[in-house]
């Protein structure tokens, strides 16, 4: 059994019911972010599903130099603070450098370490020192059993509020695959495990100057992950994925979310 992590009013791990981390890939505007957060809250309240809202203020690892990155840290954190204070939702976003950690920790309930940065020791230790919950995405280049070393870096600072997220492994060029064995392997570390169902169907750089995606497989992979006993599901959602400024090809339309979440909740109830 994994330890229980408390994030605002949300409890993850230790056989707690499935939790959802969801929101747009990137903050596109204050109005759109608030609208989507409210919609997500309504959907999750109807299903009694715990929700943590996610959105990035800066996508620092976009495929091309001309791709939209977001509003920047200052404006992005202001918008996330508004989501948190207006709607009462816990909020999560990425930190990409040590300099971002302190200001981000003033607003965010969860500091997320991107997959490409999951072995950056100084960043992990700086994030851990804030005492915030740390969600680390497993690098596409790492074996699941290697994540125990990543978690140990964070725990060395006395912070064991750690969540590990599976987001697929590199499978040749421009492709990812999900190894379902990774869930029990990473949960054996004692920390809750989340499955990133939308980034796992990404085709990195698959469109030349942007990443492609196969959202039609999100439902199948997320059902399998919940059946395998994950503690939470991470999904990027959008009102109109075809118009999203980032990761549209692998984002889920908000209109399609209620039915999928109802199925996942039912599977989780059987497994747990």
Curated annotation (Swiss-Prot):
Pathway note: Carbohydrate biosynthesis; 3-deoxy-D-manno-octulosonate biosynthesis; 3-deoxy-D-manno-octulosonate from D-ribulose 5-phosphate: step 2/3; Bacterial outer membrane biogenesis; lipopolysaccharide biosynthesis
GO cellular component terms given for this protein: cytoplasm
Keywords: Cytoplasm, Lipopolysaccharide biosynthesis, Transferase
The keyword Transferase appears for this protein: yes
Localization: Cytoplasm
One of the GO biological process terms: keto-3-deoxy-D-manno-octulosonic acid biosynthetic process
Catalytic activity: D-arabinose 5-phosphate + phosphoenolpyruvate + H2O = 3-deoxy-alpha-D-manno-2-octulosonate-8-phosphate + phosphate
Domain of life of the native organism: Bacteria
Enzyme class per UniProt: transferase
InterPro entries associated with the record: Aldolase_TIM (IPR013785), DAHP1/KDSA (IPR006218), KDO8P_synthase (IPR006269)
A molecular function GO annotation: 3-deoxy-8-phosphooctulonate synthase activity
EC number(s) reported in the record: 2.5.1.55
Family per similarity comment: Belongs to the KdsA family.
PANTHER family named in the record: PHOSPHO-2-DEHYDRO-3-DEOXYHEPTONATE ALDOLASE (PTHR21057)
Protein name: 2-dehydro-3-deoxyphosphooctonate aldolase
Gene: kdsA
